[in-house]
């Protein structure tokens, strides 16, 4: 899943230089 996707996973949001909100 990508950042901001309600049904997405937070794997792409945490770990790395990217900060974003996962729902």
From Swiss-Prot:
Name the record gives this protein: U1-ctenitoxin-Co1a
Tissue-level expression: Expressed by the venom gland.
SS bond partners: 10-20
Alphabetic keyword roster: Disulfide bond, Ion channel impairing toxin, Ionotropic glutamate receptor inhibitor, Knottin, Neurotoxin, Postsynaptic neurotoxin, Secreted, Toxin, Voltage-gated sodium channel impairing toxin
Top-level taxon of origin: Eukaryota
Predominant subcellular localization, coarse grouping: secreted
Organism for this UniProt entry: Ctenus ornatus
Subcellular location: Secreted
A GO cellular component annotation in the UniProt record: host cell postsynaptic membrane
Function: Insecticidal neurotoxin that reversibly inhibits the N-methyl-D-aspartate (NMDA)-subtype of ionotropic glutamate receptor (GRIN) and inhibits inactivation of insect sodium channels (Nav). In vivo, is highly toxic to insects.
Domain remarks: The presence of a 'disulfide through disulfide knot' structurally defines this protein as a knottin.
Family, as annotated: Belongs to the neurotoxin 03 (Tx2) family. 05 subfamily.
GO molecular function: sodium channel regulator activity; toxin activity
């Amino acid at each position: 899943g990508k950042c901001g996707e309600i049904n997405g996973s937070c794997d792409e949001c945490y770990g790395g230089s990217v900060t974003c909100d996962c729902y």
